[in-house]
Amino acid sequence: MKVIAVAQKNMGYKKQIIPADETGMILMGYLAFFDAPKKTAKASVAALKRLKVAPKILTGDQVDVAVSVCQRVEISSETVLTGARLDEMTDSELSMAVEEIHVFAELTPGQKIRLVSALRQNGHTVGFLGDGINDIPALCEANVGISVDTAVDAAKDAADVVLLQKDLGVLEQGILEGRKTFTNMLKYIKITASSNFGNILSIVCASAFLPFLPVTSVQILLLNLLYDILCIVLPWDNVDEEETLSPRDWSGRTLGRFMLSFGPISSLFDIVTFLFLVWYKKS
């Protein structure tokens, strides 16, 4: 809960106010603002954790406010790192702290940048969600800057993604769709690479042992076109649930293994066809 004190003082007809005038005022009362998390926030945070996404709070609010919000959405707040303590830490100390601590309070925009940078240097892919002026530097520093439609214009301009709904559940859906798209994209790359490798291997073998060229360049292009037409359905292909449970990095090693495994199998069918052509020609 945020509390603002309201006070008054009779200034007469004075037009210019100076800091010294802000003394001897009469307290009228307090205004209390309680910005409760949405009812769906707790479930959304739990869903992000199941997807191996570690939610962290980076806020300029006081420690008590940050802890109160985290307790309501079940984000670990046993240890809170403040901006003052962060300034005293070396880069190596901060690098270890960002792995263990999930709540950072009383931060300046520069301190938010430092935290995001530390997470990225540790090998994490960082998505930063913010809607205020103070969040703009961190939005630019993160791998993916995320804002909402009701944010200030500058924050929306700095963000890579603007959510049309102020709901963390949208993030869960976006992550799932992104992982499905990534998986299907890998399928296309693997299929295409294996096909091309198999074609090259077949042509090399044919050139070494056959007195004629069994496949022309036009026929190879036609085969690739047919492959691409078949791959049009890949965006709608089913993705196994285990493929979406954790983030995946692009790795050329898996592509190489797949290509070396399935490319020769494709070539084997080509070679059998070539041998049939040789037999047919001799007969």
PLM region descriptions:
Residues 77-128, 142, 147-283:
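Membrane-embedded transport module
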Residues 131:
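Conserved catalytic-loop aspartate of Hanks-type protein kinases
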Residues 1-118, 122, 136, 142, ...:
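Cytosolic catalytic headpieces and adjacent flexible linkers of membrane translocases
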